[in-house]
Curated annotation (Swiss-Prot):
UniProt keyword list: Cytoplasm, Exonuclease, Hydrolase, Nuclease
Annotated organism of origin: Pseudomonas fluorescens (strain ATCC BAA-477 / NRRL B-23932 / Pf-5)
EC number: 3.1.11.6
Gene3D superfamilies: 2.40.50.1010
Descriptive protein name: Exodeoxyribonuclease 7 large subunit
MF annotations from Gene Ontology: exodeoxyribonuclease VII activity; nucleic acid binding
Gene name of this polypeptide: xseA
One of the GO BP terms on file: DNA catabolic process
Subcellular location: Cytoplasm
Annotated transmembrane regions: none
């Protein structure tokens, strides 16, 4: 330790000029601080055309100017930038012209998180170039998972927070913890093994979670082995490492990144009450659409039924209606008979204590009479319906074109299917179709003559 540096330089009596003072101060500084290490953060980085590098090294309380000349700057491997934490080695010197002291550097290395940040950026760029972060590799999360694997430490607030969210929002989900170290030398290998085991278990989704910490504490989630294990998983993975401001390589590779472990649980545990409301809403919409569809189909069916004009279809409709009336009449008869019987039983029960024999006999007679009249009325009604149906069938048969053809007439049709009503509609050699009562003939016109038809009244 120098007790009296001024005595060493012979400055106890001498009066110096400014130039002399700065020169001797430079010698003193370079002698005492000739090879020192200093740690701080780069700011005001400048790279002039000379190839030298100039920047300010600072911490929370002070700053010092630094110079890294071209020959030494070429040996620095990492890219220097503002905000980078570094350790520098060099000597303290004084720029005599301004009286400013500075560090003349020969070595610059990343310091603390700075080195880790450089490694982080390098791995991030490498995996991004390989496509591990692309959206095409992401697997969508299941809407309603039933079994979820949690890869995290078995102790601490993380696992408790995740379980609490699922108990509140989706208690039916089965949670399985795959315990692993989340910090330290063994953490990387354990996390890789846990991911492989969990992916083989057939879970609906996985949560990779850890609480907050420094970049060094979270570093196992920035290891390439962990990133590739996450990418190899078939099961959808939610990465929830650190606090909201923390970002890890596993966040980029995972299918979904959650800001916190609790947020990861909420992504996979939709609120049961919300689901119930959605189900109720969908049920109401389904019922309304079914009703609308039934109404439209019924209207369409009615419209089609009104457009039907074929005699056979009309007959089938009448026959079906007759069968329906028959069944309705039978059911009405049975209901009436059952009603009468039930009423008689009730009356017998109410009057049983008084033995109303005469009234009971009258009621039985009336019941027998009704039972005898109802079948007769039913038969007469059916007979009338059959007669009415027979009459309608005869009427339809008389006006049916098929009946006319059956009496020996035919209908001539041209090649467009148009009926020939006059010889003037034909030409010699034209081919026509003759529709008969049974079958069809192909004929050819030999000649055509227009002969007026004269109707005469017979005396």
């Amino acid at each position: 330790m120098i007790k009296d540096p001024f005595a060493r330089l012979g400055l106890d009596r001498e009066v110096l000029t400014v130039t002399q003072l700065n020169g001797r101060a430079r010698v003193l500084l370079e002698d005492v601080f000739s090879n020192i290490w200093v740690e701080g953060e780069i700011s005001n980085l400048a790279r002039p055309a000379s190839g030298h590098v100039y920047f300010t090294l600072k911490d929370s309380g002070a700053q010092v100017r630094c110079a890294l000349f071209r020959q030494n700057a070429a040996r620095v491997r990492q890219a220097l930038k503002d905000g980078l934490a570094v350790k520098v080695r060099g000597k303290v010197s004084l720029f005599e012209g301004r009286g400013d002291y500075q560090l003349i550097l020969d070595t610059v290395e990343p310091a603390g998180d700075g080195a880790l940040r450089l490694a982080f950026d390098a791995l991030k760029d490498k995996l991004s170039a390989e496509g591990l972060f692309s959206a095409e590799r992401k697997v969508p999360l299941p809407a309603h998972p039933q079994r979820i694997g949690i890869i995290s430490s078995p102790t601490g607030a993380v696992i408790r927070d995740i379980i609490s969210v699922f108990r509140r929002r989706a208690p039916q989900v089965v949670l399985t913890l795959i315990p692993t170290a989340v910090q330290g030398r063994e953490a990387t290998a354990q996390i890789v093994r846990a991911l492989q085991l969990a992916d083989a278990r057939g879970f609906d989704a996985l949560i990779l979670a850890r609480g907050g910490g420094s970049l060094e504490d979270l570093w196992c989630f920035n290891e390439e082995a962990v990133a590739r294990a996450v990418d190899a998983c078939v099961t959808p993975i939610v990465s929830a490492v650190g606090h909201e401001t923390d970002v890890s390589i596993s966040d980029f590779v995972a299918d979904v990144r959650a800001p916190t472990p609790s947020a990861a649980a909420e992504l996979l545990a939709p609120d049961s009450s919300d689901l119930q409301r959605r189900v109720d809403n969908l049920h109401r919409r389904l019922v309304m659409r079914m009703r609308d569809r039934l109404v439209r189909d019924r209207l369409r069916l009615d419209g089609l039924a009104r457009r039907l004009r074929h005699p056979g279809e009309r007959l089938r409709q009448q026959a079906q209606r007759l069968d329906d009336l028959d069944m309705r009449l039978r059911r009405a008869f049975e209901r009436s008979l059952n009603t009468r019987r039930e009423r008689l039983i009730r009356l017998e029960t109410r009057l049983g204590a008084q033995h109303p024999g005469r009234q009971l006999a009258l009621l039985r007679q009336r019941l027998d009479s009704l039972a005898e009249r109802l079948p007769r009325a039913m038969r007469e009604g059916l007979k009338g319906r059959r007669l009415q149906l027979h009459s309608q069938m005869q009427t339809l048969h008389v006006v049916s074109p098929l009946a006319t053809l059956g009496r020996g007439y035919s209908i001539l049709l041209d090649d467009r299917g148009q009926a020939i009503r006059s010889a003037g509609q034909t030409r010699p050699g034209q081919r026509l179709s003759a529709r008969l009562g049974e079958g069809e003939l192909q004929v050819r016109v030999e000649d055509n003559h227009l002969t007026p038809v004269t109707l005469s009244l017979l005396d």
